[in-house]
């Protein structure tokens, strides 16, 4: 049998490979989102890329598109039914419960994560079957200040990246006291509309999901739909107003969106979304909200919680839409070019020493000639290049070239590390 060549294989439909130099931009976005979280008491958490199917069926909601249409589900040889994670909030809560972190006496448990999610969706720009998110969860406390904190931190992340053209949409979904009354009123309204059979079925299971339907013909019929804010109980009204006051006092601009719902069933009270108008139909770059009942839905105790997830892929698209170029330092500061075997041995040792001292250094591999090696040095983005030839060896020096100014200086071989550390600060 003839083995296929490597070029026969391509990334699966709806996925992409993240390659240098573009990957540096994605790493910078992840770091910009994570930095304010680390500065605010959030510890890093990592969960498996797959979980028990029932975790998502119970937590995300059996009637959601994610569970019914979009999950990658498989059965192990041992008979376990698992799913690649379509989102990470339910897995994070599962991990916290399993490790009994909620019993350590220091609530809320504040954690952040970064990782891949998988959904079988129709691929288009900004919507992939494999995508990356950075998320944050504050588990075990019912406090408007926590909701406000997370919204403020996400806003801070985007501002740090230089983004300006994003909007924050805010709403309250009520709680177990007032939402059932609204649910019944919304169902009565939806039954009187000209909706397809699938949408009517969804309206009976979870009518709030119909409000999230993006089809123009459905949205047109929803213009007179009852609004949840008119059904909020006094406690939910007071809670939501405090969230609004706290983020306003922090200088965060937001828009009240009474029809905002999220695509996951576990949200209660505060819900919010970050949208960017430069992304077309896939305008949401992130979102989240409060999920006070999720712990009980997956078999745990009552643990009111709040969190969000921001899409790394869509944030990068938002940066491109605004024409923002991130100031990403070169991955290499020094590039070494040996000309000959003895020079190769000496410079390789110096590059190793530079790296041990924290200097980002690379080496011309493959026995390239001077011209090809200098092209590689240029491509690396290195500030300085070290060139060591036979004449230099005889004199005990190396040529140090400043790639910005073009200035070239001969320095002693034994002075390389100290000289470069001094120049690079």
UniProtKB/Swiss-Prot annotation:
The entry's keywords: Aminoacyl-tRNA synthetase, ATP-binding, Cytoplasm, Ligase, Nucleotide-binding, Protein biosynthesis
GO cellular component: cytoplasm
Catalytic activity, as annotated: tRNA(His) + L-histidine + ATP = L-histidyl-tRNA(His) + AMP + diphosphate + H(+)
GO MF annotation terms: ATP binding; histidine-tRNA ligase activity
Main location: cytoplasm
UniProt xrefs under PROSITE patterns: AA_TRNA_LIGASE_II (PS50862)
EC number(s) given by UniProt: 6.1.1.21
Compartments in which it is found: Cytoplasm
Pfam families on file: HGTP_anticodon, tRNA-synt_His
Similarity section: Belongs to the class-II aminoacyl-tRNA synthetase family.
Assembly information from the UniProt record: Homodimer.
Protein's recorded name: Histidine--tRNA ligase
Native organism taxonomy: Bacteria, Bacillati, Actinomycetota, Actinomycetes, Kitasatosporales
Gene: hisS
